[in-house]
């Protein structure tokens, strides 16, 4: 049994708290708001993000980071990617010295173009071999409902990856290990942008041929970027690559796909945000940082560039489609 701290009580953080508790660990969950922590402790549910889904009574929620982090063997960071650094700067003195730090945030930091593992290493002042990434086709609601799913735990220290794997192995949740942190992170961050494109296409009423084209060519550009940054190309054919991409691009539970769908129907960014409970999809933010990261790495990412144009440069979805279909002919 491990002591696990989950820092962030959103839908995915809460779901993973349940997973680790169901796997037999001692789990503490940090929530920003007192009323949410109280609901988790007394009613054993998260009414804001996972209403009516029962949580294990063993999960102890707190608004005090020190309480949540005390004696933790595994610390899971579940806050939005663009807030991770600011939170870590406050939490760093509280982190247990030998704990494995696990990122479940999927994005690229706008200010630095750093991956989340790099943000953790920098802001917390820890060595990279203590940092792991959990990524895969893991829609929070389905996992919380105990529908069978698998994921990848990536860490350069194989022993740490295996320790997290063992701790996360609930009856309905099967973790695999991997040492390719960069590949897992690039796959997780970029798939949100491709899911926006799939949502836009669905909003325009386009069919399966279009979706399959976006997913397949999206995977190609994700792989190009990942390999240029040092990732193993085989990672992108696995759970953290193709698996995560298919789930996020296909499911109506995907916030990024839903957001893109609203844009495809002619909605503005503001209207799409309102339709997703006031939350901007991660892919909207990531399209900017990933597009700039691709430019810096001199990697062509046409779908990402097209989504960036819609989200940040006022390009219409119709014009985006015309531009993508009119690109110079090339070999696959």
Swiss-Prot record:
Q: Gene behind this chain?
A: gpsA
Gene3D superfamilies documented for this protein: N-(1-d-carboxylethyl)-l-norvaline Dehydrogenase, domain 2, NAD(P)-binding Rossmann-like Domain
Binding residue positions for NADPH: 11-12, 32-33, 106, 140, 255, 280, 282
Instruction: Tell me which EC number(s) this protein carries.
Output: 1.1.1.94
Q: Name one Pfam family in it.
A: NAD_Gly3P_dh_C
Alphabetically sorted, this entry's keywords are: Cytoplasm, Lipid biosynthesis, Lipid metabolism, NAD, NADP, Nucleotide-binding, Oxidoreductase, Phospholipid biosynthesis, Phospholipid metabolism
Any one GO cellular component localisation term in the record = cytosol
Keyword Lipid metabolism attributed:
yes
Localisation? Cytoplasm
Q: Does the keyword Ion transport apply?
A: no
Q: Where is the active site?
A: 191 (proton acceptor)
- Which top EC class is named for this enzyme in its record? oxidoreductase
InterPro entries listed in its UniProt record: 6-PGluconate_DH-like_C_sf, 6PGD_dom2, G3P_DH_NAD-dep, G3P_DH_NAD-dep_C, G3P_DH_NAD-dep_N, NAD(P)-bd_dom_sf
Annotated PROSITE patterns: NAD_G3PDH
Annotated sn-glycerol 3-phosphate binding sites? 106, 136, 191, 244, 254-256
The metabolic or biological pathway listed in the UniProt record of this protein is: Membrane lipid metabolism; glycerophospholipid metabolism
Source organism (scientific name): Corynebacterium aurimucosum (strain ATCC 700975 / DSM 44827 / CIP 107346 / CN-1) (Corynebacterium nigricans)
Q: Which reaction does it catalyse?
A: sn-glycerol 3-phosphate + NAD(+) = dihydroxyacetone phosphate + NADH + H(+); sn-glycerol 3-phosphate + NADP(+) = dihydroxyacetone phosphate + NADPH + H(+)
> Which GO annotations describe the biological process of this protein?
carbohydrate metabolic process; glycerol-3-phosphate biosynthetic process; glycerol-3-phosphate catabolic process; glycerophospholipid metabolic process; phospholipid biosynthetic process
HAMAP family attached to this UniProt entry: NAD_Glyc3P_dehydrog
Protein name (record): Glycerol-3-phosphate dehydrogenase [NAD(P)+]
């Amino acid at each position: 049994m491990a002591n696990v701290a989950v820092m962030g009580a959103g839908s995915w953080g809460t779901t993973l708290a349940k997973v680790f508790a169901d796997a037999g660990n001692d789990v503490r969950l940090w929530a920003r708001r007192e009323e949410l922590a109280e609901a988790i402790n007394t009613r054993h549910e998260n009414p804001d993000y996972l209403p009516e889904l029962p949580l294990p009574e063993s999960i102890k929620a707190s608004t005090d980071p020190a309480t949540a982090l005390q004696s933790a063997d595994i610390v899971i960071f579940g806050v939005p990617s663009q807030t991770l650094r600011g939170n870590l700067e406050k939490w760093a003195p509280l982190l247990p010295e030998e704990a494995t730090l696990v990122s479940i945030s999927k994005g690229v930091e706008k200010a630095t173009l750093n991956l989340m593992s790099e943000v953790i290493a920098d802001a917390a002042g820890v060595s990279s071999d203590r940092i792991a990434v959990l990524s895969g086709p893991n829609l929070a609601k389905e996992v919380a409902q105990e529908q069978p799913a698998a994921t990848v735990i990536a860490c350069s220290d194989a022993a740490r990856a295996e320790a997290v794997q063992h701790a996360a192995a609930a009856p309905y949740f099967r973790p695999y290990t991997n040492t390719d942190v960069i590949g897992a992170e690039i796959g997780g961050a970029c798939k949100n942008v491709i899911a926006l494109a799939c949502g836009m296409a669905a909003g325009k009423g386009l069919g399966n041929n279009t979706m399959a084209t976006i997913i397949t060519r999206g995977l190609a550009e994700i792989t190009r970027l990942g390999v240029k940054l040092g990732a193993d190309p085989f990672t992108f054919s696995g759970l953290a690559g193709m698996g995560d991409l298919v789930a996020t691009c296909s499911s109506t539970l995907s916030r990024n796909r839903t957001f893109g769908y609203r844009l495809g129907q002619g909605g503005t960014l503001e209207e799409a945000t309102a339709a997703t409970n006031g939350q901007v999809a991660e892919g909207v933010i990531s399209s900017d940082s990933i597009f700039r990261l691709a430019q810096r790495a001199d990697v062509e990412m046409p779908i990402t560039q097209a989504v960036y144009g819609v989200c940040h440069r006022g390009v219409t979805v119709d014009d985006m489609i015309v531009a993508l279909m009119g690109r110079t002919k090339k070999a696959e």
